[in-house]
Amino acid sequence: MQYDIASIIQGYAQGYFLMADDNDCLGWYGSRDRTLIPLDERFRYPKSLQRVLNQERFTVAINRDFAAVVAGCANRESTWISQELQEIYRLLYQTGYAYSFETWQGEELAGGILGIVIGGAFIGESMFYRIPEGSKVAMVKLVERLRQREFVMFDAQMMNPHLERFGAYRIKDKEYKTLLEKALLSPSTLI
């Protein structure tokens, strides 16, 4: 199947995101409230995670095994990442828009975060772990990277209890779109 990458990026740039429904039909979604991971002093994480970070058990990489991160994110009992969406992520990766931010323990993929980068916006699509704390360490290290690279926003799309522990917060759609417009003008790059 042919996909128009420019149209897909335009959809994300307008504040929408792709998801498959229970019948694997792909569609564009938006929400009245959007969840952001703070890139300032509001970002936080549990003290127990600081101990894990201090142990330096994990190393981080970008796009070392993009396909494995997509597969890890999609490998759930119920998933919104259909085969079609996995193919779109692969094409976005090949064209420089999709990234995997990974944690590794030795030669084993421990966890990762799948995201789309447009300007200074990191749009987090999904995350997973194979080794406990793998995705949490990825979150902390990704926020550090986004700060270093002067990103404007880390869009997590929808709130969940896991994200709340990192200081995630909701903003209204109008405020989100204003911030997104600013992010799109930023020359930030992940690599």
Swiss-Prot record:
It comes from the Bacteria. One of its GO terms (cellular component) is cytoplasm. Its main location: cytoplasm. Keywords: Acyltransferase, Cytoplasm, Transferase. Disulfide bonds: none annotated. Its EC number is 2.3.2.6. It catalyses: N-terminal L-lysyl-[protein] + L-leucyl-tRNA(Leu) = N-terminal L-leucyl-L-lysyl-[protein] + tRNA(Leu) + H(+); N-terminal L-arginyl-[protein] + L-leucyl-tRNA(Leu) = N-terminal L-leucyl-L-arginyl-[protein] + tRNA(Leu) + H(+); L-phenylalanyl-tRNA(Phe) + an N-terminal L-alpha-aminoacyl-[protein] = an N-terminal L-phenylalanyl-L-alpha-aminoacyl-[protein] + tRNA(Phe). It is found in: Cytoplasm. Pfam families: Leu_Phe_trans. It is an enzyme of class 2 (transferase). One of its GO terms (biological process) is protein catabolic process. GO terms for molecular function: leucyl-tRNA--protein transferase activity. Gene3D superfamilies: Leucyl/phenylalanyl-tRNA-protein transferase, C-terminal domain (3.40.630.70). HAMAP family: Leu_Phe_trans. Belongs to the L/F-transferase family. NCBIfam families: aat. Functions in the N-end rule pathway of protein degradation where it conjugates Leu, Phe and, less efficiently, Met from aminoacyl-tRNAs to the N-termini of proteins containing an N-terminal arginine or lysine. This is Leucyl/phenylalanyl-tRNA--protein transferase. It comes from Nostoc sp. (strain PCC 7120 / SAG 25.82 / UTEX 2576).
